[in-house]
Structure formats: structure tokens, C-alpha cells
UniProtKB/Swiss-Prot annotation:
CDD domains on file: GATase1_PB
Keywords associated with the record: Glutamine amidotransferase, Hydrolase, Lyase, Pyridoxal phosphate
Source organism, top-level taxon: Bacteria
Positions contributing to L-glutamine binding: G46, E47, S48, R101, I129, R130
Gene Ontology molecular function terms on file: glutaminase activity; pyridoxal 5'-phosphate synthase (glutamine hydrolysing) activity
One Pfam family cited in the UniProt record for this chain: SNO
Species, as recorded: Staphylococcus haemolyticus (strain JCSC1435)
Lineage, broadest ranks: Bacteria, Bacillati, Bacillota, Bacilli, Bacillales
GO cellular component entries: cytosol; glutaminase complex
Listed name of the protein: Pyridoxal 5'-phosphate synthase subunit PdxT
Keyword Lyase: yes
UniProt gene name: pdxT
Active-site residues, record numbering mapped to chain: C75 (nucleophile), H165 (charge relay system), E167 (charge relay system)
């Protein structure tokens, strides 16, 4: 299968590496027309306001809102997928969740944690960099993992969202899960 990584910002190469380790073709998506050539899409981390502006500029928002393409959002990608973001309206509104930005603190408060992610494994390394958390989930959203009392991974239909950066580790099981369970 062909899995795209939105290549407007973020750790694009690292995501493509995880896709390839999962046995699939990874494609850096730079043009909206490329969305028709892929089976699933990863929205990487970075800065969510910048990501939204670039998606608007290059025409990705409208195309993705109308699409039923499976999408995996990490960190800023999770924020972009959310129906609501505390203090503002959501963007793509694919996941029926409310996200709180930077809820683990500033850049200096970044951390790593071993996560038990339902359906994947009990020992997934999560890298949290100015990470959001999921403050609320609506019916139909399955919680996959938490850090303390904060939700950090969810799925709903063809959509997977995580607060952390799985691509910054050598463990590609979260990407493999997305491909196996959402893209198929």
C-alpha cells in the first residue's frame, strides 16, 4: 500500500521510514493531487497553527474534509484532526474529541514515557514535545492510552490520533497499527 505523509513541516522522513519498515511505500505528499494516489495519510507533528495555514494555502483542508481517506495524526496532526480545540474551533473535525494544546508544558517540559497502548503493546515509547492531550471524547471514540489522567491516544473509524511522536523512536508499531487497522 501507499501511505502518504503530509510534507509541509515536521518529521516527514522519520514517518516515511516507519512506513517502509512496516512493509509499505511511503510518499512525501506536497501537492493536493497526490492525495488521490495514496491509501492513507499521516499528518506529522510540528506547529499546528503553521500546519493549518499551510494546509489552507495549498488546498489540503477542503480536499481532506471531503475525503474518507484514513488519517493518522501525531501531536500537531492530532490537533488538526480534532473536532474541537480548547478556546477555538477545530479544523478537519475528523475525530470527535476536544484537544488541549501544550497541556504537558513548554518545550523544556518535554519528556518520554513508556505507554500501554490498547491493541498495540504495553511498552511503546512515547516522545512528548509541547504535547497536547485529549480533554474530552465523544461517543464512538475509543481511548487507547493515557499518561496519568490525560488521554494521549484515540481511534475512531479510519482515524488514529496520538499526542506524542512515535516517529522519533525506532519502534514503528504505532504506524503498523494504523496501516493494519485503519488503512487495511
Amino acid at each position: 500500500m501507499k501511505i502518504g505523509v503530509l510534507a509541509l513541516q515536521g518529521a516527514v522522513r522519520e514517518h516515511i521510514r516507519h512506513i517502509e519498515l512496516s512493509g509499505h511505500e511511503g510518499i512525501a505528499v506536497k501537492k493536493v493531487e497526490q492525495l488521490d494516489e495514496i491509501d492513507g495519510l499521516i499528518l506529522p507533528g510540528g506547529e499546528s497553527t503553521t500546519l493549518r495555514r499551510l494546509m489552507d494555502l495549498y488546498g489540503f483542508k477542503e480536499k481532506l474534509q471531503q475525503s474518507d481517506l484514513p488519517i493518522f495524526g501525531t501531536c500537531a496532526g492530532l490537533i488538526v484532526l480534532a473536532k474541537d480545540v480548547e478556546g477555538e474551533t477545530g479544523y478537519l473535525k475528523k475525530l470527535d474529541i476536544t484537544v488541549e494544546r501544550n497541556s504537558f508544558g513548554r518545550q523544556v517540559d518535554s519528556f518520554e514515557a513508556e505507554l500501554d497502548i490498547k491493541g498495540i503493546a504495553e511498552d511503546i515509547e512515547g516522545v512528548f514535545i509541547r504535547a497536547p492531550h485529549i480533554a474530552n471524547v465523544e461517543e464512538g471514540v475509543e481511548i487507547l492510552s493515557t499518561v496519568g489522567d490525560k488521554i494521549v491516544a484515540v481511534k475512531q473509524g479510519k482515524y488514529l490520533g496520538v499526542s506524542f511522536h512515535p516517529e522519533l523512536t525506532d519502534d514503528y508499531r504505532v504506524t503498523q497499527y494504523f496501516i493494519d487497522h485503519m488503512v487495511k
